[in-house]
A protein has these predicted regions:
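Secretory targeting signatures
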Residues: 1-5, 85
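Conserved beta-hairpin
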Residues: 12-52
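A conserved beta-strand-loop-helix scaffold within acyl/acetyltransferase catalytic domains
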Residues: 42-64, 70
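A conserved beta-turn-beta hairpin within the catalytic core of GNAT-like acetyltransferases
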Residues: 57-68, 77, 96-99, 127-129
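Conserved acetyl-CoA-binding loop-helix of GNAT-fold acetyltransferases
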Residues: 72, 78-91, 116
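Conserved GNAT acetyl-CoA-binding A-motif
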Residues: 93-106
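Conserved active-site alpha-helix within GNAT-family acetyltransferase domains
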Residues: 106-129
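C-terminal "cap" of GNAT-fold acetyltransferases
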Residues: 127-179
Length: 179
């Protein structure tokens, strides 16, 4: 944990290797990271970081924490680092008095990864057409196959990359992944 929002932590990620790299320079969100062991960094970017998440309070619900951005270094995607890091932030949110954690995702890969972190689709979207997922901080969300598939169907209705289309086809009629 680099720090919570009041601490103003910042992080310089290489934009060529991380999605949303510019969002981690901002000091108005908390940050947590997974780092390579024994990797020292004294360069322009924090090259030891493998995954990062930025988060802050929900402005309308003091009992909720929003995960704002989750990113995994391009060569380490698919290893479960993002879900593991999100579970760690959720665990620490429990100690800070939060009751639930939310995130809005914009692609089916993130949707799947956050289900692996114990989140479930709420049926809601943001104004940016992101799907809102939520979980209590003290346990995973209830596994709801119908809600999970409904979220996947919302992605299917979009203009997708070939990789996203193939991924969604493999997920047709399957149950949500387990944490």
């Amino acid at each position: 944990m680099l720090g919570w929002p009041p601490d103003g932590p910042t992080l310089r990620l290489d934009y060529r290797r991380f999605s949303y790299a510019g969002k981690f320079v901002m000091s108005n969100t908390g940050k947590a990271v997974v780092r390579e062991a024994d990797e020292a960094t004294d360069r322009e970017y924090d090259d030891a970081v493998l995954a990062a998440v930025a988060f802050n309070d929900d402005r309308t619900d003091p009992s909720a924490l929003w995960l704002r951005y989750v990113t995994v270094r391009d060569d380490r995607r698919g290893e479960g680092l993002g879900p593991r890091l999100c579970r760690r932030v959720v665990a620490e949110a429990t100690d800070r008095g939060y009751e639930r954690t939310r995130i809005a995702v914009n692609n089916p890969f993130a949707y799947e990864a956050l289900h692996r972190a114990g989140f479930g689709f709420t049926g809601e979207t943001t104004g940016l057409a992101e799907l809102v997922l939520e979980r209590p901080v003290d346990r995973p969300a209830e596994r709801d196959p119908g809600a999970y598939r409904a979220g996947l169907d919302r992605f299917r209705a979009r203009d997708l990359s070939a990789a996203e289309t193939e991924f969604l086809e493999r997920k047709r009629d399957v149950d949500p992944p387990r944490e």
